[in-house]
């Protein structure tokens, strides 16, 4: 029987630990279990984060093992080699697929029946690997995808327009990586098309400005890694938001990575497209309006991911 207030984090690196810290403050769970190959690391992180519980809400945070996944509502997998300066996310494929081959079968052995959230990179590839290795229904295996990329885009647009980023509605779709696509055609600020809002705010070089913003968003992870060796706060907040949507059955629309079938002539590959997300995971895709150029770039992104999947032996 699933404990609807229990989450498990697999791997206590920068991303995993920051995500647990964010989840501790969310009030979503009363039990959070940390699993790591280094048991001392898991115990230390659990102790440290637990000391913040008096400032949050009552819960248990502790180091555990794979038996703890059996009744968990959500298992978050952040395990994987980190991205180094100069590396792309796709450079991590072989190393992190090997790690997933050791982790996912352990989860499957426990008859896990909750939602699996993949956060490790390359997230689109690893989400599809997790589906194949776990045997779980596709709707219950979700990748963090371009949730963070889209948040970065909204932040940059809000900064550019001097408006609250929460009023900006814009998605990055496709790969969480170098072939990502900004869906400019559907971008708006509280219902006002982005190009119109730019002019209203005194910005008349719309194409040049949006191109600069898209480049800044795409390169932001590389820039952060070059400066501080890892990114973890932004993705931790993304993990918290995805967990909120699932645990509260919000049916919110998020650009998470999931298996795509028949949207924009794409089939049989995991990538990010806006989807309705709730207690059962992915409910349905939302095929947002794209220009011909955007649809072509999305197809190219999907094809590049497919080619990589074809090289992986599972």
Positions of PLM-derived features:
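Extreme N-terminal starter segment of soluble prokaryotic enzymes
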Residues: 2-7
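Glycine-rich Rossmann-fold phosphate-binding loop(s) that bind the pyrophosphate
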Residues: 12-13
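N-terminal Rossmann-fold NAD(P) dinucleotide-binding loop
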Residues: 16-17
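Conserved S-adenosyl-L-methionine
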Residues: 25-31, 135-138
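Conserved N-terminal Rossmann-fold NAD(P) cofactor-binding segment
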Residues: 31, 35-73, 87, 306-314
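Rossmann-like NAD(P)-binding element
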Residues: 54-115
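Rossmann-like NAD(P)(H) cofactor-binding subdomain of soluble oxidoreductases
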Residues: 88-154
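C-terminal substrate-binding/catalytic lobe of Rossmann-fold NAD(P)-dependent dehydrogenases
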Residues: 134-140, 150-314
């Amino acid at each position: 029987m699933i404990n609807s207030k229990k989450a498990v984090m697999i791997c206590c690196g920068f991303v995993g630990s920051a995500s647990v810290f964010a989840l501790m403050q969310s009030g979503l769970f009363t039990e959070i279990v940390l699993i790591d190959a280094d048991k001392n690391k898991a115990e230390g992180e659990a102790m440290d984060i637990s000391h913040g519980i008096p400032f949050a809400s009552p819960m248990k945070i502790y180091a555990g093992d794979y038996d703890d996944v059996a009744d968990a509502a959500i298992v978050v997998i952040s395990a994987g080699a980190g991205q180094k300066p100069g590396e792309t996310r796709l450079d991590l494929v072989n190393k992190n697929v090997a790690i997933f081959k050791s982790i996912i079968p352990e989860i499957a052995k426990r008859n896990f029946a909750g939602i699996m959230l993949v956060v490790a990179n390359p997230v689109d590839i690893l989400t599809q690997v997790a589906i194949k290795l776990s045997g779980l229904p596709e709707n219950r295996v979700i990748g963090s995808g371009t949730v963070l990329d889209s948040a970065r885009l909204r932040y940059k647009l809000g900064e550019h327009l001097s408006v609250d980023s929460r009023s900006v509605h814009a998605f990055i779709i496709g790969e969480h990586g170098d072939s990502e696509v900004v869906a400019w055609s559907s971008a708006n600020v509280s219902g006002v098309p982005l190009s119109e809002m730019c002019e209203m705010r005194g910005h008349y070089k719309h194409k040049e400005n949006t191109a600069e913003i898209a480049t800044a968003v795409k390169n932001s992870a590389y820039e952060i890694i070059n400066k501080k060796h890892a990114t973890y706060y932004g993705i931790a907040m993304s993990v918290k938001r995805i967990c909120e949507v699932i645990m509260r059955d919000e049916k919110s629309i998020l650009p998470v990575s999931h298996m795509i079938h028949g949207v924009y002539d794409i089939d049989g590959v995991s990538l990010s497209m806006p989807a309705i997300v709730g207690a059962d995971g992915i409910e349905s895709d939302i095929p947002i309006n794209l220009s011909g150029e955007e649809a072509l770039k999305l197809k190219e992104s999907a094809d590049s991911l497919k080619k990589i999947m074809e090289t992986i032996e599972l």
